[in-house]
Regions:
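Structural beta-alpha unit
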Residues: 1, 80-123, 160-167
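Small/aliphatic-rich secondary-structure junction motif
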Residues: 1-63
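General small-molecule cofactor/ligand-binding pocket signal
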Residues: 36, 99-103, 154
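Short secondary-structure boundary segments
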Residues: 37, 127-128, 157-158
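A short acidic, glycine-rich active-site loop
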Residues: 56-76
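Glycine-rich, Arg-bearing micro-motifs that act as flexible, cationic patches
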Residues: 122-147, 162-165
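Short, flexible loop segments at boundaries between secondary-structure elements
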Residues: 151-162
Length: 167
């Protein structure tokens, strides 16, 4: 029985398509829906630039407060994009969303950790992000999640939409 699900989004071009699948499944099963977006950690170059311009205290403050601000902003962006996509009739669907979480880390690991932490019954993902070329049918994150997930994975194919010209 499916009582709760996790929709993992990259906030890319095809995120609204995958979201529609997630909401339709949540409606069908009358299930709770959680949303997660992974934010890659800051690269070494960016970190070294910050270190050269900020003292240790300012750097620590940036890491704690800056990251919290960015994460809160992304969480709000996700909710706003859902509202925009669903329109006025979608308020009931929005009520199914229990939480939007933005977590820093490797995307596949973040998704798998959230599956376990939230004890969801189903994971919903797209086949790949907007950055992967048409010759790659399955992205790195989707591949790792499929291989390592301990719950069923609902995989939304994005290649067909690209071939039809995004109608």
């Amino acid at each position: 029985m499916i009582r709760s699900m996790l929709y993992a989004t990259d906030l890319g071009l095809y995120a609204p398509l995958v979201m529609q699948h997630a909401l339709a499944l949540a409606r069908t099963f009358n299930a709770d829906l959680y949303v997660v977006h992974a934010v890659e950690p800051m690269g070494l170059f960016a970190e070294s630039v910050l270190q050269s311009y900020l003292d240790e205290q300012a750097l620590n403050e940036f890491h704690s407060q800056g990251l919290k601000t960015v994460i809160a902003s992304i969480e709000q962006r996700v909710l706003d994009s859902f509202r925009e996509e669903l329109g006025d009739e979608g308020e009931q669907d929005l009520q199914r969303i229990c939480a939007v979480r933005v977590v820093q880390g490797d995307p596949a690991q973040v998704i798998l950790d959230q599956v376990q932490k939230l004890s969801v019954d189903l994971l919903i993902v797209g086949t790949h992000s907007h950055g992967v070329g048409a010759e790659t049918p399955l992205g790195r994150t989707a591949t790792r999640v499929l291989q390592l997930a301990k719950v069923p994975v609902y995989l939304v194919p994005l290649m067909e939409r690209r071939r039809r010209g995004d109608r």
